[in-house]
A protein has these predicted regions:
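Short, charge-dense linear interaction motifs
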Residues: 1-223
């Protein structure tokens, strides 16, 4: 019995696209000799940060507050002597309109006892770019199979299998799409007004890989 010849190929594609969102992390801190006053001061500064972020309206996609903490400061060389208390909080802001990013970071950096880290550029988890990359990888696999078949005077006739990388051989863990999220700047608050910071969105690399197996017509072998 003659087995119909097959072709196993890997399709892959890398897309370079603009980011869809930018994430900025804002650390808020307060220090006082009294624990209650330290917490009250933290609450006041945290509220100011939240108000500044929310004032940007639709440009901000999401605002999230992290857990707050307060701990005593001990005098050097002692275990029990408390000299004051430090309270900390964190706010994470996700921005979709990058035109407000510079003003927001510069404004936040001007707040007392506030540290700004970011932005981190990325795509949304449900970004259509990810689907586009997967489809392009599948199309690349088909094109490769056709080229290989054509080299032997044959044509592709049927798709047998299409799978994430490694699954055809039950080997590697699948890894279809990932996005490179790069580009970060840091701005730490000072009492003086900060110069306006400029941010250039960093392109995101989205890579998709698929394995495929096709059947083809009988090859024409010379010689």
């Amino acid at each position: 019995m003659v087995t119909q010849p097959s072709i196993s190929v890997r399709g892959e594609v890398t897309l370079e696209v603009d980011p869809e969102i930018a994430v900025v992390s804002i650390a808020v801190m307060a220090r006082d000799k009294d624990r209650r006053r330290a917490l009250d001061l933290l609450a006041k500064r945290n509220a100011a940060v939240l108000a500044m972020a929310r004032a940007l309206g639709d440009a901000v996609e999401k605002v999230e507050s992290g857990a707050a903490s307060v701990h005593p400061e001990l005098k050097d060389g002692t275990k029990e002597r408390v000299t004051g208390y430090v309270a900390r909080g964190n706010v994470t802001v996700t921005i979709s309109d990058f035109t407000v990013l510079s003003d927001m970071v510069t404004g936040l950096a001007g707040e007392e006892m506030v540290a700004v880290t970011g932005p981190w550029w990325s795509l949304r988890p449900d970004s259509p770019v990810r689907r586009r990359a997967r489809v392009s990888a599948a199309q690349d696999a088909l094109q490769r199979a056709r080229e290989y078949a054509d080299a032997f005077g044959a044509t592709v006739t049927e798709l047998v299998q299409l799978a994430d990388p490694g699954l055809l051989a039950d080997a590697d863990r699948p890894q279809i799409v990932h996005a490179r999220t790069a580009g970060r700047a840091e701005a730490f608050a000072t009492a003086a007004a900060a110069e306006e910071l400029e941010f250039e969105p960093v392109k995101q690399s989205v890579r998709a890989v698929v394995d495929a197996r096709f059947l083809m017509t009988a090859p024409t072998l010379g010689g």
